Amino acid sequence: MDNRKRLAYAIIQFLHGQLRHGGLSCDAQESLEVAIQCLETAFGVTLEDSDLALPQTLPEIFEAATSSKQEMPQDPRAPDRTPPSEEDSAEAERLKTEGNEQMKLENFEAAVHLYGKAIELNPANAVYFCNRAAAYSKLGNYVGAVQDCERAIGIDPGYSKAYGRMGLALSSLNKHAEAVAYYKKALELDPDNDTYKSNLKIAELKLREAPSPTGGVGSLDIAGLLNNPHFITMASSLMNSPQLQQLMSGMISGGHNPLGTPGSSPQQSDLASLIQAGQQFAQQMQQQNPEFVEQIRSQVVRSRTPSASHEEQQE
């Protein structure tokens, strides 16, 4: 028999009971009568269909369900909060230490396996999850790293390294807004950490300025530079410099560069003169258009990737 009809009958039975004994106002009683009529029409059920009655009334079923709530089995996905034995804790630490050694040897897959074994023995240790996140990042599994960092933060919300490694993984996934938030949290917990400061700055730059699709190596916008009138003007000025023309002429002819220092080889003199010309060009750019120089500097910083130097130190 259709259980929906049984359920509808139980509800209608309950509403009729409320009409008789509920002590309701006239308006409330009228509303219940309308509700009963709607249910009877929708399900084709009336109170006379006693064959649909259940052994228990709806209030009795509800009371039984709420009273047994505490006896429901635990969600199997919930972490086991039973403290590990001393033997398991010691073995988990040994596995973690061995995993750290494998990280130093760049055996990242082995490290993931060892940290996983440590987690099986002691799933309440945030360090194990955070260390495995670092190994996952080394393997390019940034999604796995994010998940392990989330577990570590769930266990220990004050663990700064978990936030820092989360920022690294999110940056690698180009989720710079989220990375910025996690780097800021890491700095709140460890305000003197220079790596977090540097990575936060890089993530903020990447968030503000998306790399140009025509950018060159390292996402430096070469096309933009070549089309910038300030850059063209200063480059033309440099190329028309008598000093640079004399230098280039000497390098092409293979002769000694008169700009070099006495006693130095032609190659050394040419190199020193070329460096000097480059420095003069940079100074000229800084004096004539400091905003443009800052733009170039920002592009160079933006092209860098966050550093994991501090994060590579496993605990």
UniProtKB/Swiss-Prot annotation:
Tell me what this protein is called.
Answer: Small glutamine-rich tetratricopeptide repeat-containing protein alpha
Name the UniProt key words of this record, in alphabetical order. Acetylation, Chaperone, Cytoplasm, Nucleus, Phosphoprotein, Repeat, TPR repeat
What is a GO molecular function of this protein? protein heterodimerization activity
- Pfam families in the record, alphabetically? SGTA_dimer (PF16546), TPR_1 (PF00515), TPR_8 (PF13181)
Could you tell me which species this protein originates from? Answer: Mus musculus
Per-repeat ranges for TPR: 92-125, 126-159, 160-193
UniProt modified residues of type Phosphoserine: 85, 303, 307
Residues bearing Phosphothreonine are 82, 305
Q: Which residues carry this modification: N6-acetyllysine?
A: 138
Q: Where is this protein found?
A: Cytoplasm; Nucleus
Q: Where is the composition biased (Basic and acidic residues)?
A: 72-84, 91-100
> Gene for this protein?
Sgta
Q: Which GO terms describe its biological process?
A: ERAD pathway; negative regulation of ERAD pathway; negative regulation of ubiquitin-dependent protein catabolic process; positive regulation of ERAD pathway; positive regulation of ubiquitin-dependent protein catabolic process; tail-anchored membrane protein insertion into ER membrane
What are the record's GO terms for cellular component?
A: cytosol; membrane; nucleoplasm
Name the segments for region: Disordered.
Answer: 65-100, 249-270
